[in-house]
Amino acid sequence: MFGFLNVNKPSGITSHQVISKLRKITGIKQIGHAGTLDPLACGVLPVAIGKATKLLDYLPSDKAYIVKMQFGKRSDTYDIEGNVEETNYRKVMLVEIEKGLVFQRGKVKQIPPAFSAVHYNGKRLYELAREGKIPDDIPSREITIYENEILNFDFDNQILELKVACSKGTYIRTIVNDLGEYTKAGAVMCELTRINSANMNIEDAISLTDETTKDDILSALIEPKKVIDLPIVKLNDEHYKKVLNGNKFKLNSEIGDVLLSFEDKIIALANSDGNYIQPKKVLL
C-alpha cells in the first residue's frame, strides 16, 4: 500500500490516535501524518502510507481553518480546554474586530502559546507551562496570514466565526488570543476545523469508523503527484535501472526537486541541476 490519505480527524482524539487506528485497520506500521491537530481540533489530517512517508516533508505546507471564538474570556491555553476566566469586559463591536484583523494579515510576527510543542531551552513549552515555569521571552516567529475573513458574528453571545488561510507554523489559538488582547476583552478558541491542508479539502476527507476496512483505505488512497507540487520527469527503461541503484543519470529537466515517474507511477524523488538527475528517495 502506497500513497496519501485525506482523513477527517474528529474532535476529542489526538492525531497519533488516528495513525494507531489506521495501523490496526491496514496492518501496516509505516504510516505517518503531516501537521498535527490538537485534540480539540477536527478536520483534514494528511496521512502517508507505506513509502509515501518519505514524501511527507514535500507536501504543501499552507493550511486553511474555520475557527470559532468567544470574546469576554481568557484562558492559559488560549482555548476552552484551559483554565478559563471571565473578563467582564463590555461587549466587543464588529468594527473593532475588523480593525484588529487588519493587523493580522500578511507577514506578521507571532509568539507561540505557552501550551505548545515548541522547544525552549531543550524542553517543550507545554512541559514548562505544566510546571508553572512559563518563560516571558518566548521567541516570536514570522508567519504569513493570507486571509482572515469573518464568516459570522453573534453579537449577543460574542461568538465570532473566522476563516483563516495561513502558512506552516501558524497557531490559530494565538490569533484568537491576539485578537482578544487587541479588543481588550480577551478571547478563547471554542472550535477549530482544518478545511484544507496539503492540497486536500475537507469535502473529500474520509472518516474512520469501526466499519472502515482495509479496502476502504485502499480505494481512498491519493497518488503523490496529485498533492505534491513538484515537476514530474518521465523515465525510460535505462533511467529506471539507474534509479533502482540510486545512480545519477543524464537527463534535461527543471532545476530543483522533481518526482520521477515510470510507467505512470511515481517511483522516486530526485534533485536535478538541469542536466543530471540524482535520486534522493527511492519509493520502490
Write out the residue ranges for each language-model feature.
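Acidic, low-complexity central loop/insert segments
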Residues: 58-112
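Residue-level signal for inorganic ion chemistry
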Residues: 47, 67, 122, 175, ...
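Accessory RNA 3′-end/elbow-binding domains used by RNA modification enzymes
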Residues: 1-10, 16-37, 41-44, 95, ...
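Extended alpha-helical targeting/anchoring segments
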Residues: 116, 120-140, 144
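The conserved catalytic core of RNA pseudouridine synthases
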Residues: 24-28, 46, 136-184
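Pseudouridine synthase
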Residues: 117, 121, 129, 158-203
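Glycine/acidic-rich beta-strand-loop module
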Residues: 30-60, 127
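Structural signature of FAD isoalloxazine-binding scaffolds in flavoprotein oxidoreductases
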Residues: 56-71, 135-149
